[in-house]
Amino acid sequence: MTATLKKPPIYKVLYFQVLTAVVIGVLLGHFYPSLGVDMKPFGDAFIKGIKMLIAPIIFCTVVLGIAGMEDMKKVGKTGGLALLYFEIVSTIALMVGLVVVNVLQPGAGMNIDPASLDTKGIAAYTGPGKMGTTTEFLLNIIPSSAVDAFAKGEILQVLFIAILFGFALHKFGGRGTMVFDLIEKTSHVLFDMIAIIMKFAPIGAFGAMAFTIGKYGIGSLFSLGKLMGSFYLTCLLFVFIVLGIIARLNGFNIFKFVRYIKEELLIVLGTSSSESVLPRMMEKMELLGAKKACVGLVIPTGYSFNLDGTSIYLTMAAVFIAQATNTPMTLLQEVTLLAVLLLTSKGAAGVTGSGFIVLAATLSAVGDVPVAGLAIILGIDRFMSEARALTNLVGNGVATIVVAKWTGELDQKQLTRALNRDDWIEAQEPEMILDHQQDKMR
């Protein structure tokens, strides 16, 4: 047993491979921009490979979790507490962004005339139909057909189907039935497929980063460096102070948690999409002691309702545009902006570019800030996407552990052991460790 738990050489560890790939991608994109842009298919292929399995993995995980539960009341309790947590923490994130941007004022002194801006680049984000109403968003959770939900990879629609299927399967016997066993075996196969695809994560991160630097250039980072610096600083403060306090109150350390998911963070840094590690995060949250049913409900739901990084970005970007264009905003107008963002931010999925679409829709709805001002930040939005995705990922991970503890679905001893023994966690693939733990339980 000691041999199987031996820590592998550094060059075989995924986070080292991804970090190296990201650095190489940055260098290639900077010194050979055209070649860097040509590397885009590598990043796209990796993300598509992960996305093709997200829907079936969510379905299997949620169905197994719900159908295998003894007390079905816990499902409703878990969902209710998760939504309550999402709303509270998202509101805090919006407020933190609003406070910091008013204190640092990164847009002050730019004196940009909105009429002089070239708005052709933002037309794709501000066109009609890009952002639906709240009613349309809620109705869209119900798919037109089950096949359509899986074909399009709509996370909330798949989650809706999985919850219904899980309840129905529980009614007909749940654990021990042939259908349950089939779904359980299918789940193992799907996670094995994810493990295979994750071997190519360094190549995907390299391609995505080389493209980003090659297309937009490092120079674009400096032109609006104050906004980027303020945003990255705010995200760090939110993660290590706000989420840090929440973590401490619930019995774990945020620094150890971030270290625990460092591989996933590096992959997200390279791809700018938190969806690229969704299946792996579900595995790792189970390894921390959260039960499958809780993980299956909280993680997928959080990808639409608990986007802390996107929330920070939305308030900071909106007020920054107002400052840069010398558009005065009263306290009432900022509170109104906050209230509108509480609704519109829920429509931002965990994919690249969604935050910009939501920002465009919000500015159009509020009317106080010129929508043309979006052209100011269009060039650096891709670089800010990394911080959004990273903060979203940490936020959803913390939310899962917190909700699991609130509902009594967390093994505190396993949580402590996993966070304190990262060498044991890194020694093997997550699915191998899960199998090892299940064998011990038997």
Swiss-Prot record:
Transmembrane intervals = 13-33, 49-69, 81-101, 149-169, 193-213, 227-247, 312-332, 336-356, 357-377
Keyword vocabulary terms for this entry = Cell membrane, Membrane, Symport, Transmembrane, Transmembrane helix, Transport
GO (cellular component) term, any one: plasma membrane
Look up keyword Transmembrane helix and say if it applies.
yes
Any one GO biological process: L-aspartate transmembrane transport
Q: What does this protein do?
A: Responsible for the transport of dicarboxylates such as succinate, fumarate, and malate across the membrane.
Family annotation (NCBIfam families): PRK01663.1, PRK13027.1
Protein name in UniProt: C4-dicarboxylate transport protein
- Name its species: Polynucleobacter asymbioticus (strain DSM 18221 / CIP 109841 / QLW-P1DMWA-1) (Polynucleobacter necessarius subsp. asymbioticus)
Its taxonomic placement starts with: Bacteria, Pseudomonadati, Pseudomonadota, Betaproteobacteria, Burkholderiales
